[in-house]
């Protein structure tokens, strides 16, 4: 696994540009990152949105659009569907969310994923870099599924492990987060964790190591955890847990987060609306590396 986002960015610069559909780039940070991503050789952008509006934003931001292709589409859902169709057809390697509600993009991704494979489901992978931890780790799924059942968790885990395999993490360590009750009995989440561990032992997910522990306290050694023992993937039981965990890492531990949402090999970058130019540049680099590794584009 990559040790930090600088390493991922360096890898992106080696790979060369990929065609990316930028969904509703009518925001200063989005259009600036798009232009710089093109300059750095990360992407060849296709801007999808209301042409008059995004052109005005680019002009106000001092960003020349030059030869960037623009597809004029005012309806947000139609625009999101169009972007995913481009990836399905091979006309783009990935989609980048701009100034639009994530819901539209998730709907389009779920639709496209089901068209390609009825037994897969999209999920969000949040890649985290934290000071003092010499590797990037993933939390899933804090974005798409509100409270996934066991079958859905299998699909989420399959997705996450496939992505990490493609990034060179040949035997990812997984922790399925759950809690024990005070009386010693197990919750539904703990039962799911045990079932997933058994499936992992049986080879259901390919090469991986699903930890029997269901929280970090169980693997502490004198108050600390070695990088080797720290999971590469944390599978959360529901969307609330995922959001709390991701935001806590961001704001309490001073972490850096980059999110991608993946389903049936379709890749969308889902930065937060509050993310600035530098974070979005890192997100483009991650998208390029994941697309090159997972899709072989």
Residue ranges and their predicted role:
Residues 1-297:
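Anion-binding alpha/beta catalytic cores of soluble intermediary-metabolism enzymes, centered on
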């Amino acid at each position: 696994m990559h040790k930090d986002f600088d390493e991922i960015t360096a890898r992106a610069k080696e790979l060369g540009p990929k065609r990316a559909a930028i969904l509703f780039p009518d925001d200063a940070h989005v259009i600036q990152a798009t232009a710089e991503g093109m300059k750095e050789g990360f992407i060849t952008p296709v801007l999808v949105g209301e042409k008059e509006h995004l052109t005005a934003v680019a002009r106000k931001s001092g960003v020349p659009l030059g030869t960037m292709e623009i597809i004029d589409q005012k309806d947000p859902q139609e625009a999101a569907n169009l972007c995913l169709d481009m990836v399905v057809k091979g006309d783009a390697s990935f989609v980048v969310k701009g100034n639009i509600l994530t819901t539209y993009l998730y709907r389009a991704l779920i639709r496209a994923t089901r068209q390609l494979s009825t037994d897969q489901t999209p999920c969000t992978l949040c890649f985290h870099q934290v000071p003092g931890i010499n590797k990037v780790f993933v939390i899933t799924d804090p974005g798409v599924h509100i409270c996934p059942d066991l079958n859905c968790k299998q699909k989420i885990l399959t997705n996450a492990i496939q992505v990490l395999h493609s990034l060179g993490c040949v035997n990812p360590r997984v922790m399925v987060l759950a809690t024990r009750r005070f009386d010693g009995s197990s919750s539904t989440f703990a039962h799911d964790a045990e079932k997933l561990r058994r499936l992992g032992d049986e080879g259901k997910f390919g090469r991986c190591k699903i930890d029997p522990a269901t929280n970090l306290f169980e693997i502490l050694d004198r108050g600390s955890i070695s990088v080797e023992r720290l999971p590469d993937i944390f599978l959360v039981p529901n969307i609330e847990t995922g959001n709390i965990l991701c935001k806590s890492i961001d704001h309490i531990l001073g972490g850096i987060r980059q999110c991608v949402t993946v389903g049936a090999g379709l890749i969308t970058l889902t930065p937060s609306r509050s993310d600035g130019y530098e974070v979005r540049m890192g997100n483009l680099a991650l998208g390029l590396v994941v697309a090159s590794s997972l899709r072989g584009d």
